[in-house]
Amino acid sequence: MFYADGILRKSSLIDEIPGIFHGFSTRFGGKSTLSHTASLNLSHDLGDSADIVRENFEIFARTISGGVYGGNATVTLHQIHSAKVRVLTRENAGEGYSIPRGEDGDGFVTADSGVIPVARAADCVPILLAGLRADGNPVVSAVHAGWRGTVAGIAAEAVRVMESLGCERPTIRAAIGPHIGYCCYEVGADFYETVCGLCGTEFAGRHITIPDGKAKHHANLTSMNAEILGNAGIAAEKIDISPDCTMCMSDVYYSHRATGGKRGVHGAGIGIL
């Protein structure tokens, strides 16, 4: 179950994994004063000064970690709507904050403390995962799943990379964070045809349908990612799903569609104590 914790949204399933911290940010609690980025914008490319964005990362990192880590532990990357997942070590801490970003991609996995992977979104799907190795130590992941990354299977790729670091699949919990819901995600026929070509007509038919009273198809990124995680071996009861639609709740979250692209971005961060 998702719940509010001050300016954050959290997953009770992720909380079950000991020795970690996590959180999905909202628009609240930051230093941005521009109308479209107020107030916890986590992007340097949307109008805020570099100093303000750095302050926002500092707030976010300290809030999710309970004051243990600051912004210099965070890592972001240039997200490219792919299924590419990077392995991080504590030596990567600060990429995108105080030192240049590393290679492009859309997800992170780490088994190290001292580094906070942050996936960023403003309608796309942020996913956090956590599990344990046989020795009881945690492995965590943060993923940005746009529709292209979703159908390319980035959620399953994150599970695979976690296992490559020794994480035991039965221990993995996943939290699908706030994103644009089926209610608002209208798509065209070309979108449907593209997903059919990539994932098959049965998959597309399950997740891209025309709602009652609507004229066009809507895509369900929630159910797509839940199915992909299930096919990767994550049991349904270990997948937490936020009920919040970023477009419906654009006063709480940043939404690209609700604002015509004039917005900030929020973050999904996770780390090891």
What are these regions (language model features)?
Residues 1-273:
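Active-site microenvironment for binding and transforming phosphate-containing groups
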